[in-house]
UniProtKB/Swiss-Prot annotation:
InterPro entries with a match to the protein in the record: G_ENGA, GTP-bd, GTPase_Der, KH_dom-like, KH_dom-like_a/b, P-loop_NTPase, Small_GTP-bd
UniProt organism field: Nitratidesulfovibrio vulgaris (strain DP4)
Biological process annotations from GO: ribosome biogenesis
Binding positions (GTP 2): 237-244, 284-288, 349-352
Annotated GTP 1 binding sites: 9-16, 57-61, 130-133
Family named by the database record: Belongs to the TRAFAC class TrmE-Era-EngA-EngB-Septin-like GTPase superfamily. EngA (Der) GTPase family.
Disulfide bonds: none
Protein's UniProt keywords contain Magnesium: no
Name assigned to this protein: GTPase Der
PROSITE patterns: G_ENGA
Residue ranges annotated for the EngA-type G domain, each copy included: 3-178, 231-404
Length: 495
């Protein structure tokens, strides 16, 4: 694995903006409101012909008593304790730490406590004085931070001042013996990509991912389609459906902060793990609510990031609450994924809370309500007890394989003859549609084009029959599929 460096500091000192700048992406949500980041996020800092290294963005540490940092998390409760735990785990994983401070606010007592705490870890520490907008301000704004006893560097994450120098200083903190790192495929699997997402009126996606979205140096990434690339699974669902609990249960870690408070997760967070020699990445996302219920700007950014994450995953895991049943928002999310032909499966979580006598009726109700997208797998699970969790990853891997299916044109046309012979298309306006040939236009998902004499005469039930037949003949049971009908005359011109 790559050597890692952690970004640690108080809330709102600019750690997430700095993280986005260093990895040249818009992964972390940034906002002027303190405490936006909660779960730690990881990315890769790359440079042309330069050694890559990992970087971890941690939540802002804020406690009622400054001494609590020096004494440890005992007695600290709520999100503050979980954020501190996440920061401690990040520091333990890293070879060095960047203590990020605010040059405009100056040295605060809490910064000194954090520095004292980091000194006891024995890790190399670099004090990064952020929000210093030019070289003329460096001496004035950084002078008092030298008292901390660590090397000091002034930067501006927002305007890019000294960021190349910062990268160089961070590389100097890396141990010489860790030169190899991991391969490109594994490295890319730990970075969340950025992709555009369509917006539906019932789902709030406005506002963008972060204020730094248009900054110079920010680039977009895409998920890898190669079969050997680690499987990426995106968790999606309403707030408090148990997405983070499922990630923790599936990976056997406490990687995600979990609480009964809806909206605990804000960023879309990658959690990589290995099982049976194979690598996987779960992307935990913020809960998606209806537009009318979103009043917080940070939540708007979080929802937008959640929906974008589905376009960057191989398979999306839509998590529902077994106790609450399917809500109108759940239905809208299912319809949205189905319309976009997103590979997904539905996980009905919290089955341990459903009385034993009511479980079968509850399962039947879920199946009936999801009858309109029969190809989508439906699993009843429990993050708390582990019920049916072992079925999730193998089924997701199967969906990914089905999405990559490529069928030769000759085989397709032989299948088309068999399907049409078995069931002729109905006569429409005194004319029976005539099929010429079929081809596969693309995969991801499988897309088939059938050329006929008049595409307008193909009715919806017969189109559904064609799709079901293709699924049966070629083993595409759960992946989304597109079937297009094109008009073609003797001159092979398309309408």
């Amino acid at each position: 694995m790559f050597a890692k460096i952690a970004l640690v500091g108080r809330p709102n000192v600019g750690k997430s903006t700095l993280f986005n700048r260093l990895i040249r992406s818009n992964r972390a949500i940034t906002h002027d409101m303190p405490g936006v980041t909660r779960d730690r996020m990881e990315g890769i800092v790359r440079g042309r012909n330069k050694r890559p290294f990992g970087i971890i963005d941690t939540g802002g540490i804020t406690l009622d008593g400054h001494a609590a940092v020096a004494e440890g998390p005992a007695g600290i409760r709520g999100f503050e304790a979980e954020i501190l735990r996440q920061a401690e785990e990040a520091i333990a994983e890293c070879v060095a730490v960047c203590l990020v401070v605010d040059g405009r606010e100056g040295l605060l007592p809490f910064d000194e406590h954090l520095a004292s705490y980091l000194r006891r870890t024995g890790k190399p520490v670099l004090v990064v004085v952020n929000k210093v907008d030019g070289i003329e301000k460096e001496d004035v704004l950084t002078a008092e931070f030298h008292i901390l006893g660590f090397p000091v560097l002034a930067v501006s994450a927002e305007h890019g001042h000294n960021l190349r120098w910062l990268e160089s200083e961070m590389r100097d903190l890396l141990p010489e013996e860790d030169e190899d790192g991991i391969d490109d495929d594994a490295a890319d699997a730990t970075a969340v990509a950025s992709a555009d997402a369509d917006v539906d009126a019932d789902v709030e996606t406005e506002g963008g991912t972060s204020a730094s979205e248009t900054e110079e140096g920010i680039t977009e990434e895409t998920v890898e389609d190669e079969p050997e690339a680690p499987l990426r699974l995106c968790m999606l669902g309403r707030p408090n459906a148990g997405k983070s609990s499922l990630v923790n249960a599936l990976t056997g870690t406490n990687r995600m902060i979990v609480s009964d408070v809806a909206g605990t997760t804000r960023d879309s967070v990658d959690v990589a793990f290995e099982k049976d020699g194979l690598s996987y990445t779960f992307v935990d996302t913020a809960g998606v609510r209806r537009r009318s219920r979103i009043t917080d700007t940070v939540e708007r950014y979080s929802v937008n990031s959640s929906l974008k994450s589905t376009t960057k995953a191989h398979v999306t895991l839509l998590v529902l609450d077994a106790v609450e049943g399917i809500t109108s928002q759940d239905k809208r999310l299912i319809e949205l994924l189905d319309e976009r032909k997103t590979p997904f499966m539905v996980l009905v979580n919290k089955m341990d809370l459903v009385p034993a006598k009511a479980r079968e009726d509850g399962k039947r109700n879920f199946r009936d309500l999801l009858n309109f997208c029969q190809h989508v797998p439906l699993l009843f699970v429990s993050a708390k007890t582990g019920y049916e969790l072992r079925s999730i990853v193998p089924l997701a891997a199967r969906i990914r394989r089905e999405c990559s299916v490529r069928i030769p044109t000759g085989q397709l046309n032989r299948a088309m003859e068999e399907v049409i012979t078995r069931h002729q298309p109905p006569v429409v306006r005194r004319v029976r549609p005539k099929f010429y040939y079929m081809t596969q236009a693309e995969s991801q998902p499988p897309t088939f084009v059938l050329f006929v004499n008049d595409a307008d005469r193909i009715q919806a039930p017969y189109a559904k029959y064609i799709e079901k037949s293709l699924r049966r003949l070629f083993g595409i049971e759960h992946a989304p599929m597109r079937v297009h009908f094109r008009s073609s005359h003797k001159k092979n011109s398309e309408k």
